[in-house]
């Protein structure tokens, strides 16, 4: 397995992977999300590749105060092999190298499988309520 930075030629394969991982939401246009990331610190957008196939992703961010991780997904046929752990570990190292003191991840409360993985990796539940406000309406995907 190789973990590397996203490249333009990964575009369609990544969107297909996100569909398989059930990461797409009607209110988010994944093509726009990728375009936006490519224009703003693509070095934190990582893919895991096995035998030339993209099997995992994580899209990281850092605002100078906190890091974040989005679009963490692993192809269903490749789960249980430590790929998500490796992606998060690499992202964490990149954030630490920038002086990032903390990373936050938003997870649906009912996603027990993923919550368990994050807890095993040392993530703790923060008594915070995540609020959001859409500033630009994407077309429904």
From Swiss-Prot:
Q: Which gene encodes it?
A: ypeA
Q: Which residues form the N-acetyltransferase domain?
A: 1-141
Q: Which Pfam families match?
A: Acetyltransf_1
The enzyme's main class, written as a single word, is transferase
Question: What keyword terms does UniProt attach to this protein?
Answer: Acyltransferase, Transferase
Reported EC number(s) for this entry are: 2.3.1.-
Source organism, top-level taxon = Bacteria
Q: What does the record give under GO molecular function?
A: acyltransferase activity, transferring groups other than amino-acyl groups
The record's similarity note reads:
Belongs to the acetyltransferase family. YpeA subfamily.
The name this protein carries in UniProt is Acetyltransferase YpeA
Organism per entry: Shigella boydii serotype 4 (strain Sb227)
